[in-house]
């Protein structure tokens, strides 16, 4: 037990009772009444031991109404959150408290949010592909099981729909669950994701136990302590499913940049000397501690997809640059493709993956992917000629390449289960083998006689040939 000696915005200095010095990361609870007579209950986390018998703590909720001299109680342990089967379908805050007005989250199991990464001996050393059922991803920028994927793309290019499809597919194909951490993003986006997950039955309101995703939010309006620590709460919930239930888990972090930004605010308020571009001197350590917890063990895996905001489009900024060091793959969403109506609008040439190597994915997959990329690259080069004088100015060979590339571009689109509401066509999960087979038929020209519309928004190649037959009948 101690009392508050100083308050600087979301940061408090507390003088503990003699001989009762709390450890770093312990949570303190400040209770009292504000001048208006309302009860105050603020949880803080110890960040620094200052000497002269004081500690500096960062609050996890607003510090309005706190006063010097108020009592603070040391809980003797780090922040702990409820984990387990009770979390899917619910929205929690950084402390694991529900914020969806559906009653309390009562779990017999709680985990502290500060946990060490799995030991090297527990890691799964085998490189394996994490099949998503999305053609463009599995073929050209495959995800690694237990890997980290950066998701790049502006507003309105289909990021939320892609995330929901992945949540849906991991539940159906891998029997896994997902955890989505909203780190310092707009409250509207968190609300949109919640509403859309309910609409597409990823969250089942009638029977929450059938839900496939747990949501943890620390949005833009929260103090920096909450925005920084929600980046630890979400992985903690995911670790339960990996370590105890031995499942494959998908962890979404939206947005990893805001995690760094919140850490920078806390660092400045704690009085640390800033480093490059005003970021915290501990940037690499904070990022590493979070990212190292996201991995495959021999029991299960956490595969993480992180939306990366690039400030002022500067890839050399310390925040995105530190993030890139940890990524295994990047999925870049393109506004140009979205404008053409090709969804998912994943850019096939800009998206990359360290897994696309012949000794990992196999010779057949690698050759097919390279063929697709080469054809699309050759289609990209004469765009100016196509746009102004028209296709007639191209050589016969180039015209054939363009025709095949346009078929490939359309075949990379796919109807999503969660987007059935918008597209009206049933969603499709396409296995990697079917994807490779389809492109192996388009590349050498086996399907040159089919119209390009036949390849748009279909699942596997058999559906494209069936669609072509239907189009021919309608044409007659």
Swiss-Prot record:
<keyword id="KW-0406">Ion transport</keyword>
<keyword id="KW-0813">Transport</keyword>
<dbReference type="InterPro" id="IPR036121">
    <property type="entry name" value="ATPase_F1/V1/A1_a/bsu_N_sf"/>
</dbReference>
<dbReference type="InterPro" id="IPR024034">
    <property type="entry name" value="ATPase_F1/V1_b/a_C"/>
</dbReference>
<dbReference type="InterPro" id="IPR005722">
    <property type="entry name" value="ATP_synth_F1_bsu"/>
</dbReference>
<dbReference type="InterPro" id="IPR027417">
    <property type="entry name" value="P-loop_NTPase"/>
</dbReference>
<dbReference type="InterPro" id="IPR020003">
    <property type="entry name" value="ATPase_a/bsu_AS"/>
</dbReference>
<dbReference type="InterPro" id="IPR004100">
    <property type="entry name" value="ATPase_F1/V1/A1_a/bsu_N"/>
</dbReference>
<comment type="subunit">
    <text>F-type ATPases have 2 components, CF(1) - the catalytic core - and CF(0) - the membrane proton channel. CF(1) has five subunits: alpha(3), beta(3), gamma(1), delta(1), epsilon(1). CF(0) has four main subunits: a(1), b(1), b'(1) and c(9-12).</text>
</comment>
<dbReference type="InterPro" id="IPR055190">
    <property type="entry name" value="ATP-synt_VA_C"/>
</dbReference>
<keyword id="KW-0934">Plastid</keyword>
<keyword id="KW-0375">Hydrogen ion transport</keyword>
<dbReference type="InterPro" id="IPR003593">
    <property type="entry name" value="AAA+_ATPase"/>
</dbReference>
<dbReference type="GO" id="GO:0045259">
    <property type="term" value="C:proton-transporting ATP synthase complex"/>
</dbReference>
<dbReference type="GO" id="GO:0016887">
    <property type="term" value="F:ATP hydrolysis activity"/>
</dbReference>
<keyword id="KW-0067">ATP-binding</keyword>
<dbReference type="GO" id="GO:0046933">
    <property type="term" value="F:proton-transporting ATP synthase activity, rotational mechanism"/>
</dbReference>
<comment type="function">
    <text>Produces ATP from ADP in the presence of a proton gradient across the membrane. The catalytic sites are hosted primarily by the beta subunits.</text>
</comment>
<protein>
    <recommendedName>
        <fullName>ATP synthase subunit beta, chloroplastic</fullName>
        <ecNumber>7.1.2.2</ecNumber>
    </recommendedName>
</protein>
<keyword id="KW-0547">Nucleotide-binding</keyword>
<dbReference type="GO" id="GO:0005524">
    <property type="term" value="F:ATP binding"/>
</dbReference>
<keyword id="KW-0150">Chloroplast</keyword>
<dbReference type="Pfam" id="PF00006">
    <property type="entry name" value="ATP-synt_ab"/>
</dbReference>
<comment type="similarity">
    <text>Belongs to the ATPase alpha/beta chains family.</text>
</comment>
<dbReference type="GO" id="GO:0005739">
    <property type="term" value="C:mitochondrion"/>
</dbReference>
<dbReference type="InterPro" id="IPR050053">
    <property type="entry name" value="ATPase_alpha/beta_chains"/>
</dbReference>
<keyword id="KW-0793">Thylakoid</keyword>
<dbReference type="Pfam" id="PF02874">
    <property type="entry name" value="ATP-synt_ab_N"/>
</dbReference>
<dbReference type="GO" id="GO:0042776">
    <property type="term" value="P:proton motive force-driven mitochondrial ATP synthesis"/>
</dbReference>
<dbReference type="InterPro" id="IPR000194">
    <property type="entry name" value="ATPase_F1/V1/A1_a/bsu_nucl-bd"/>
</dbReference>
<keyword id="KW-0139">CF(1)</keyword>
<keyword id="KW-0472">Membrane</keyword>
<feature type="binding site">
    <location>
        <begin position="153"/>
        <end position="160"/>
    </location>
    <ligand>
        <name>ATP</name>
    </ligand>
</feature>
<dbReference type="GO" id="GO:0009535">
    <property type="term" value="C:chloroplast thylakoid membrane"/>
</dbReference>
<dbReference type="Pfam" id="PF22919">
    <property type="entry name" value="ATP-synt_VA_C"/>
</dbReference>
<keyword id="KW-0066">ATP synthesis</keyword>
<keyword id="KW-1278">Translocase</keyword>
């Amino acid at each position: 037990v101690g009392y508050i000696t100083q308050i600087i915005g979301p940061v408090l200095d507390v003088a503990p009772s003699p001989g009762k010095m709390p450890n770093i990361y312990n949570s303190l609870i400040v209770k009292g009444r504000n001048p208006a007579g309302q009860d105050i209950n603020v949880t803080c986390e110890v960040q620094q031991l200052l000497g002269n018998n004081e500690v500096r703590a960062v609050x996890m909720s607003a510090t309005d109404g706190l006063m010097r001299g108020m009592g603070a109680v040391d809980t003797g342990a780090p922040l702990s959150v409820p984990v387990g089967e009770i979390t899917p379908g619910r929205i929690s805050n950084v402390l694991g408290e529900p914020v969806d007005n559906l009653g309390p989250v009562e779990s017999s199991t709680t985990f502290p949010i500060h946990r060490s990464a799995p030991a090297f001996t527990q890691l799964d050393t085998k490189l394996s592909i994490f099949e998503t059922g999305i053609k463009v991803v599995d073929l050209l920028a495959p995800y690694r099981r237990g890997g980290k994927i950066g998701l790049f793309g502006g507003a309105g290019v289909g990021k939320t729909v892609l995330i929901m499809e992945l949540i849906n597919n991991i539940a159906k194909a891998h029997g896994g669950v997902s955890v989505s951490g909203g780190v310092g993003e707009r409250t509207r986006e968190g609300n949109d994701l919640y509403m859309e997950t309910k609409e597409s039955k990823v969250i089942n309101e009638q029977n929450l136990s059938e839900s496939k995703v747990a949501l943890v939010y620390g949005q833009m309006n929260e103090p920096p302590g909450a925005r920084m620590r929600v980046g630890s709460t979400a992985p903690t919930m995911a670790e339960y499913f990996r370590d105890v239930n031995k499942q494959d888990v998908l962890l979404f972090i939206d947005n990893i940049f805001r995690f760094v930004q919140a850490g920078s605010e806390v660092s400045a308020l704690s009085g640390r000397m800033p480093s490059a571009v005003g970021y915290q001197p501990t940037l690499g350590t904070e990022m590493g501690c979070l990212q190292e917890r996201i991995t495959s063990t021999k029991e299960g895996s956490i595969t993480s997809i992180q939306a990366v905001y690039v400030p002022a489009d500067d890839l050399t900024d310390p925040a995105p640059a530190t993030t890139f060091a940890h990524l295994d793959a990047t999925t870049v969403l393109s506004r140009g493709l979205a404008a053409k109506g090709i969804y998912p609008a994943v850019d096939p040439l800009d998206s990359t993956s360290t897994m696309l190597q012949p000794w990992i994915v196999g010779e057949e997959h690698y050759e097919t992917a390279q063929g697709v990329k080469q054809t699309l690259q050759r289609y990209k080069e004469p765009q100016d000629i196509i746009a102004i004088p028209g296709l007639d100015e191209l050589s016969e060979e180039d015209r054939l390449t363009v025709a095949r590339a346009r078929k490939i571009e359309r075949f990379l689109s796919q109807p999503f289960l969660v987007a059935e509401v918008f597209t009206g066509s049933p969603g499709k999960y396409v296995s990697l083998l079917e994807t490779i087979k389809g492109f192996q038929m388009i590349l050498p020209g086996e399907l040159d006689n089919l119209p390009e519309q036949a390849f748009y928004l279909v699942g596997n190649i058999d559906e494209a040939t069936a669609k072509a037959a239907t189009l021919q009948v309608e044409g007659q």
